[in-house]
Amino acid sequence: MKRVILLAAAAIALAAPALADDCTITVGVVMGLTGPAGEYGQAGAKSVEMAFRDLNEAGGPHGCKLVADTRDSQSQGSLAVDAANQLVQLKNVPVIIGGIISSVSIPILTSVTGPGKIVQVSPASSSPTLTNLGRAGKTNGMFFRTITSDALQGTAAAKYALDQGFKRIAVIHVNNDFGVNMLAEFSKAYKALGGEIVSVSPYNEKQSSYDAEASKGIAANPDGLYLIATPVDGATIARAWISQGGPAKFLLNDGMNSPDFIASVGAKYLNEAYGTSSGTSPTASTEYFNANYKAFSGGIDPSTPAADRAYDAGAIVGLAIAAAPTQDPVAIRDAIFRVTSKDGEPIHAGKADFAKALDLLRAGKPIRYEGVIGPVSFDRYGDITGPFRLWKIVDGKVTTVGEMSTDDVNALKAKIVK
């Protein structure tokens, strides 16, 4: 076991030998701890650390200790690629978990993990481009993600928007792969269901002002604004929209499910703010995570986007390392399917169940990891399915008001195609 393991999720660098005499398995984490997606990356990195702590307390894979080597991508694809290359080329890592946002995960995949046949697991990148790369044979079957694709979420958002009275909508979206694809999927469904998009304004991250984008959207006389953004830029855009007299009615993407966004904009302006997120099917893991994460993370709310899914990404990787006969990337990839087997023994988060899992894996038996987000099962492209959470901001808090199942969304998509 002379390999280091990288989890892509950029943050702090913890240099450690690949496998020291004390049997330490170093796992690299590349997540954006700073930049527009810094809130997600900080939550995700802590979640991976928590999963590793639980696995270590259970005995560790092959009796070894998992340690995270975390690097900060600053939410930038080029920096993430540099970090991933260093970890793969200099430390010979077989796995990368990350990034958080699609505009970071995609360049890691196309530049490093795909060509190099290195396992990559993202906890939060939802762009349909990642599925398309798999279909085109560009991932070599090495990519996985613990979040549903925007190909489904865009349809769920369109139906929810119309149900909440958004008949004419303006759109302001981040000008990257995530924003462009989310808008494309939403637009197809929204128009087919009878909605009208009256204005579209892409924006670049970290602009000094978003007044022009807000002004353009308001001039089109919409019922409200569909804001596809990250919390920092999204709050600035929302404030510009409100200050210029735009209707205080918002449709928000999953990443805007953020206490920081609400605090920055002001809860009193968000009484008609609605959103969709990749949902969960609650299990014992969900209860465990929600009860323990805040204390472990130093106060981060367990509902922070990417927190739950990053724990599951870390747990699945750690269990796959334990299940694999060697630390070869292909062996770990194959083991991911064994630890999420529909025929396996159900395993939940935490020390006790992880100890049970390690015993079963040593005996050569499959397990079914039922994670914080629910039972996890990957298809041939590394995608998962799951419900979509429908939420509304009520008294300054994100409140679940409904759910759309994957079957509901697929039925709606089929109807739209016809």
Label each region the model flagged.
Residues 2-8, 20-418:
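Extracytosolic ligand-binding ectodomains
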Residues 8-14:
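Hydrophobic alpha-helical targeting segments used for export or membrane insertion
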Residues 14-20:
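Sec/Tat signal peptide C-region and signal peptidase I cleavage site
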